[in-house]
């Protein structure tokens, strides 16, 4: 057998008849499968053991030779070779066809490849192949033309007239003759001449033909191989036949299809031997052609062949296609051993890097390890008895299991895995019961909750896999979210509430103004009821371990609360003492106003001080981010565990809970509603008098009720007590918001109907009062729409992620520096006047393209190719610089990837990105994962027609697929001035742009809003009317940079409007993939073909070559492809075929004789190699793990 895992590349091509025969181990002559009595394969049939190998290991068909000692012997009685039965998975057979047939992929595809080679229409081809017309194959010296079609009648007439002077025939034989007559070199030269003169349709056709003919010429495939003389039969184990319980057989559809081919082939042979009339023979040949078509691609032409119950049979093509096909089901979706799944429950006692694994599950998963250990410890004599011990669950097994799982990480995964944090490593601890215990802080990353979610466990087996899991995937290492570099493990719900309650301050609480010598004394007083957690007290500053106090502060008393003393115990000693939720307190030091001299009147000072806000969810997030920045991963994960414990403990102690009595109903609600109602009546009066239109009336009613609800909401919030549990939950960010509260205690407000239009009848009741039947009915609309939307959105968003991953899967960091001298100009992203993304956000973690100097002092702030970190970015912004040249993935020169400098910092680790990081997949996941949070709706603004702006998910799809947007804007194609704006017929507006050389006029629909006025100076690509620009148009008019910036800006706009932050670099990686291709306009002296799509790198290489020889380079224009199109245009045919349109991709690749260099991740997964990213890259492959080595001095890197 060939070494399956070690090859450099993979080729695909057409198989010649000789090639097919060389694969084969024998000819299948009979349609029989197995003998119904003996259940053994029939000789020469579809399962024949002589051709395909024995059905049982080391045993021939007749039983003369049994056992392995006869290995390689061919039985003299039955002719079966004695070998392993698994050869039946790889040995092929063949069928010698009595008449040639055409391969349906090449004849039926779009465009028809056979048609292009022969310059015949697919209609004509079909008539010939299916025996409806004759085609002239050799006109000799008659007036007929080669490739001319003749009907039966015409053929007879010409035969009478010219006799045997000319030759015409039908079927695939005729096509085969024509294909063999083609002289590729001559045809290609003729077409190249034709291209120089022709225009329009003829030119397009010529380009298409040239492409196919060149492909044949360069690949070494012969056109006549598109016609099959011999048909390969795939190995029987790949089209199995199994016996069911009832004694019946279930078989693969392929066997039926093969059987039809063999039957028709044998009948045709018999008819030819008998010398049957030509009409019968022709009919049989046509049926054979149809049988082969059905086998290769059933249903491509005519009605599909059906099995029992009118179900179309699955042909060879269907075996590859779609989600259930070979590619996506078996090659990219393999199931793995050593895995299990169970329900998850919360494990609040766990450390960040731990998970609880049920005992029985762990025993099953680690069985082989336990067996080995049992034997090594002498508790079992051999593997068999060890296995028996485990199956009987004897007591000593548990001790061994404990020692085996120690420091052996497992992977936990929750479906759907939307980003890389959906699968993380943990150290297992054994737990009773049957549920997996999950650490509460990783729930955000998994998007898990404990209402019945299930998770899967996988065991990394090899030492390398364990090391990778521990170093790269351990939950304690994955604190930052790859999409924006912010911590993903912020506390939530109970934990937030506990810490909020702990840090509350209350004026006049019990024991206010007491002075303590240290924390312990304060806690003692709290436990004995002398002070409360919320009491403001004073503590000697020098008793606290905090290092950040200044000398002056140390000598004084610190004013704080007992709760804050407890809270600060969990922070590192060199972190400022947190006394108020402000940026300066987190980043610099505790403000001086909290310190007072010893001997001062503490109570009086405290009474004058304002109350400080407690620590809400956002502040906790900022504290975590700051700790991560200063102390790095290990310290952060320890601190997070402490914060979690504190939160749970104090939310339990606080006993915060919700009762009906906590929902306080507003007293003057009725008056507000009556006032609103009278305003609505007024509006109605105006409408009835014809003073306002229906549309205006509707708008006004809606706005009256909305403002009434706002008034109620405002009053409610004011009337709430600080310690009201509902208020605390919403204020702390634990659960709920002001709107939820308004619905509970105020009014539910306006609802939308199923079409998304707001119903003008508001729900005046609140949940506390109860809804009337009508109100209840109205609110069901909204609820149902919400659920339906969510279901649709999930599928849409998942499909978007799949396309994004597919287009960017081969983008890997391949080198340190590509040496480019280009970059992009980073400015703040604005929408109108509102800043969507600040300049410093765009700069952090990027490399500077040019040296940046302070505009006033001239001091160098940052050098060329230097990393801009948080502090440097702040310096740049504070210096008043508004735009900065930075390195970007847009301008990176690395083929098949990006370089470290152009990419910048890895957001997930906060450090430089490593060579080998799969940044393409990370980018795709970062954009796709928040997809479910985006809205589905198209917003209707004020009912102005033609003004529906697409937002949310549909807009993202529109941008990445480069579709013509809804509500398209008109853009100017030239620089110039707006000369005039006129109204023309049909209420349209005409905008005349006067340039230096030419004048252009644009018409815009009557109701579109203009963005320009007469006399304005405009540049090419500028918008004239409101709406979204079509990026393809923009590319025609302007340059690459403009389009890149536009796409980046638009994508960011959609996400930021929904409150989702995504790093620019992710969008850059995706947009770069969409702009990778160039359409060749003029080939110059290169050997590229005009009209073809080429990768930018291939294009520049080809040009470099001719320029060095002093010849004319090719010219091309960049093309913007949508992500689906871009993934199908990738260089790797394996990746493209496993994505969509499998047959088209493979047909094309086979004709071109494509070679897949296996550069991306997908191709390597498909063929079962390690992916060429991360530790799978060539330079890491040489690293071998060594077990149990004691570390020495020289192993430890210097700090």
From Swiss-Prot:
Q: Which Pfam families match?
A: RNA_pol_Rpb1_1, RNA_pol_Rpb1_2, RNA_pol_Rpb1_3, RNA_pol_Rpb1_4, RNA_pol_Rpb1_5
Q: Which cofactor does it need?
A: Mg(2+); Zn(2+)
In its UniProt record, a GO molecular function of this protein is: magnesium ion binding
Q: Where does Mg(2+) bind?
A: 449, 451, 453
Arranged from A to Z, the UniProt key words for this protein are: DNA-directed RNA polymerase, Magnesium, Metal-binding, Nucleotidyltransferase, Transcription, Transferase, Zinc
Q: Does the keyword Oxidoreductase apply?
A: no
Give the CC-aspect GO terms. DNA-directed RNA polymerase complex
| SMART domains noted in UniProt | RPOLA_N (SM00663)
- Does Nucleotidyltransferase count among this protein's keywords? yes
Q: Recite the UniProt cofactor note for this protein.
A: Binds 1 Mg(2+) ion per subunit.
Which NCBIfam families does this chain map to?
rpoC_TIGR
Q: How does it assemble?
A: The RNAP catalytic core consists of 2 alpha, 1 beta, 1 beta' and 1 omega subunit. When a sigma factor is associated with the core the holoenzyme is formed, which can initiate transcription.
- What family does the entry list? Belongs to the RNA polymerase beta' chain family.
Q: Provide the protein name.
A: DNA-directed RNA polymerase subunit beta'
The organism is Bacillus velezensis (strain DSM 23117 / BGSC 10A6 / LMG 26770 / FZB42) (Bacillus amyloliquefaciens subsp. plantarum)
Query: What lineage does the source organism belong to?
Result: Bacteria, Bacillati, Bacillota, Bacilli, Bacillales
* Gene that encodes it: rpoC
């Amino acid at each position: 057998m060939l070494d399956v895992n070690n090859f450099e590349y993979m080729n695909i091509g057409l198989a010649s008849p000789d090639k097919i025969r060389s694969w084969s181990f024998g000819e299948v002559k009979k349609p029989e499968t197995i003998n119904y009595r003996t259940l053994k394969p029939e000789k020469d049939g579809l399962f024949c053991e002589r051709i395909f190998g024995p059905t049982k290991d080391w045993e021939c068909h007749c039983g003369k030779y049994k056992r392995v000692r006869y290995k390689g012997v061919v039985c003299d009685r039955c002719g079966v070779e004695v070998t392993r039965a698994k050869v039946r998975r790889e040995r092929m057979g063949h069928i010698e066809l009595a008449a040639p047939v055409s391969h349906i992929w090449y004849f039926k595809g779009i465009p028809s490849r056979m048609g292009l080679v022969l310059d015949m229409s697919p209609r004509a081809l079909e008539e010939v192949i299916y025996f409806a017309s004759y085609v002239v194959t050799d006109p000799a010296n008659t007036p007929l033309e080669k490739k001319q079609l003749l009907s039966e009648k015409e053929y007879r007439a010409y035969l009478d007239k010219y006799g045997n002077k000319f030759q015409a025939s039908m079927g695939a034989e005729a096509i085969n003759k024509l294909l063999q007559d083609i002289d590729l070199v001559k045809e290609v030269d003729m077409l190249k001449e034709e291209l120089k003169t022709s225009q329009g349709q003829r030119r397009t056709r010529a380009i298409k033909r040239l492409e196919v003919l060149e492909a044949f010429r360069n690949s070494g495939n012969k056109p006549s191989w598109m016609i099959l003389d011999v048909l390969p039969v795939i190995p029987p184990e790949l089209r199995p036949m199994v016996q069911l319980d009832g004694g019946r057989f279930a078989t693969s559809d392929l066997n039926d299809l093969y059987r039809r081919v063999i039957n028709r082939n044998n009948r045709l042979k018999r008819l030819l031997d008998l010398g049957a009339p030509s009409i019968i023979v022709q009919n049989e040949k046509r049926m054979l052609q149809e049988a082969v078509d059905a086998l290769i691609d059933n249903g491509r032409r005519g009605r599909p062949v059906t099995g029992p119950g009118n179900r179309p049979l699955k042909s060879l093509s269907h075996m590859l296609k779609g989600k259930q096909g070979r590619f996506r089901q078996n090659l990219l979706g393999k199931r793995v051993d050593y895995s299990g799944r169970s329900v998850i429950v919360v494990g609040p006692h766990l450390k960040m890097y731990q998970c609880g694994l049920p005992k029985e599950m762990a025993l099953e998963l680690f069985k082989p390890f336990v067996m080995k250990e049992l034997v090594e410890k002498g508790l079992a004599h051999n593997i068999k008895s060890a296995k028996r011990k485990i199956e009987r669950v004897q007591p000593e097994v548990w001790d061994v299991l404990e020692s085996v799982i120690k420091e052996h990480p497992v992977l936990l995964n929750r479906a759907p895995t939307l980003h890389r944090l959906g699968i993380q490593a943990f150290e297992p601890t054994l737990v009773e019961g049957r549920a997996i215990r999950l650490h509460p802080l990783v729930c955000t990353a998994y998007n898990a909750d404990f209402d019945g979610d299930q998770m899967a466990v996988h065991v990394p087996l090899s030492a390398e896999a364990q090391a990778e899991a521990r170093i790269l995937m351990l939950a304690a290492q994955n604190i930052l979210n790859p999409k924006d570099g912010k911590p993903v493990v912020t506390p939530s719900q109970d934990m937030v509430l506990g810490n909020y309650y702990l840090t509350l301050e209350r004026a006049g609480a019990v024991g206010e103004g007491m002075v303590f010598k240290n924390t312990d004394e304060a806690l003692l007083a709290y436990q004995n009821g002398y002070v409360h957690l919320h009491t403001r007290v004073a503590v000697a500053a020098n008793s606290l371990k905090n290092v950040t106090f200044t000398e002056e502060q140390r000598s004084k008393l610190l004013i704080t609360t007992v709760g804050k003393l407890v809270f600060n115990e969990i922070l590192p000693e060199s972190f400022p003492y947190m006394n108020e939720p402000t940026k300066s307190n987190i980043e610099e030091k505790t403000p001086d106003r909290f310190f007072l001299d010893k001997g001062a009147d503490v109570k009086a000072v405290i009474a004058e001080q304002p109350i400080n806000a407690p620590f809400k969810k956002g502040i906790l997030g900022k504290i975590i981010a700051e700790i991560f920045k200063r102390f790095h991963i290990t310290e952060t994960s320890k601190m997070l565990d402490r914060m979690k414990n504190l939160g749970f403990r104090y939310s339990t102690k606080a006993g915060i809970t919700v009762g009906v009595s906590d929902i306080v109903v507003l007293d003057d609600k009725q008056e507000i509603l009556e006032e609103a109602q009278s305003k609505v009546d007024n509006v109605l009066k105006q409408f009835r008098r014809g003073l306002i239109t229906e549309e205006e009336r509707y708008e006004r009613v809606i706005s009256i009720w909305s403002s009434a609800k706002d008034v109620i909401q405002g009053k409610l919030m004011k009337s709430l007590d600080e310690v009201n549990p509902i208020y605390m939950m919403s204020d702390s960010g634990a659960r709920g918001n002001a709107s939820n509260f308004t619905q509970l205690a105020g009014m539910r407000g306006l609802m939308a109907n199923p079409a998304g239009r707001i119903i003008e009848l508001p729900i005046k009741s609140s949940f506390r009062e109860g809804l009337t039947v009508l109100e209840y009915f109205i609110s069901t609309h909204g609820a149902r729409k919400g659920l339906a939307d969510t279901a649709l959105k999930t599928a849409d968003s998942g499909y978007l992620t799949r396309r994004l991953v597919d287009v960017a899967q081969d983008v890997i960091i391949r080198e340190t520096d590509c040496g480019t001298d280009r970059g992009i100009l980073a400015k703040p992203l604005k929408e109108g006047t509102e800043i969507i993304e600040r300049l410093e956000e765009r700069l952090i973690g990027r490399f500077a393209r040019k040296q940046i100097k302070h505009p006033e002092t001239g001091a160098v702030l940052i050098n060329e190719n230097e990393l801009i970190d948080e502090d440097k970015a702040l310096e740049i912004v504070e210096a008043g610089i508004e735009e900065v040249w930075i390195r970007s993935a847009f301008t990176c020169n690395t083929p098949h990837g990006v370089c470290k400098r152009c990419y910048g910092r890895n957001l997930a680790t906060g450090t430089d990105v490593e060579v080998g990081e799969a940044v393409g997949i990370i980018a795709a996941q970062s954009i796709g994962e928040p997809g479910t949070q985006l809205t589905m709706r198209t917003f209707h603004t004020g009912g102005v027609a033609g003004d529906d702006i697409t937002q949310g998910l549909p807009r993202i799809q529109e941008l990445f697929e480069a579709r013509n947007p809804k509500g398209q804007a008109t853009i100017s194609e030239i620089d110039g001035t707006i000369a005039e704006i006129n109204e023309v017929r049909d209420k349209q507006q005409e905008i005349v742009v006067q340039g230096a050389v030419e004048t252009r006029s644009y018409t815009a629909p009557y109701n579109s809003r203009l963005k320009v006025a007469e006399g304005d100076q405009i540049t090419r690509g500028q918008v004239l009317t409101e709406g979204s620009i079509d990026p393809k148009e923009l590319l025609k008019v302007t340059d690459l940079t403009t389009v890149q910036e536009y796409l980046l800006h638009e994508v960011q706009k959609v996400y930021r409007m929904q409150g989702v932050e995504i790093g620019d670099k992710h969008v850059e990686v995706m947009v770069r993939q969409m702009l990778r291709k160039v359409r060749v306009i003029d080939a110059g002296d290169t050997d590229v073909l005009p009209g073809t799509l080429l990768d930018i790198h291939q294009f520049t290489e080809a040009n470099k070559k001719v320029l060095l020889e002093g010849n004319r380079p090719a010219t091309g224009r960049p093309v913007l492809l949508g992500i689906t199109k871009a993934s199908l245009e990738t260089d790797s045919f394996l990746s493209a075929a496993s994505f969509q349109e499998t047959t088209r991709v493979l047909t094309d690749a086979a004709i071109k004789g494509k070679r897949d260099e296996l550069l991306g991740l997908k191709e390597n997964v498909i063929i079962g190699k390690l992916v060429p990213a991360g530790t799978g890259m060539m330079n890491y492959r040489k690293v071998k793990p060594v077990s149990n080595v004691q570390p020495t001095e020289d192993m430890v890197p210097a700090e």
